[in-house]
Amino acid sequence: MIKAQQISKYQNGCEKILQIPGIRFAALINNKGRIISGGLSEKITPYEKDEEKRNVLFMEIALDLTMRKEFTNTLGSIHAIVSYRDKVNIITIPHRENFILLSVEPELDSQRIINLVRELL
């Protein structure tokens, strides 16, 4: 369970990440797919306007990350997962028992963004 002080720290971190041009969404999400802190950039219009569908996506990503962790002993830890789509890149970064989820413009350098996020959080 994350304490209120930690949530505030992560919220501030997500807000800093959202200031980076091209970042559409930045949030800390728990292993059940629920947003702990962060959210959509106020500068963009979301491609998926249905909040329920977005929540289903978060749950699917949480499940996918959990399933991929089964190979940690043989392949090593997951540092990040990047899904390259036509309109956005989705970046998942494991963070303790939770994960950071980012939606970024496709022209951004995903590895650079991952490194910046690790520095901020």
Description of each model-found segment:
Residues M1-L121:
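Non-catalytic interaction/Regulatory regions outside core domains
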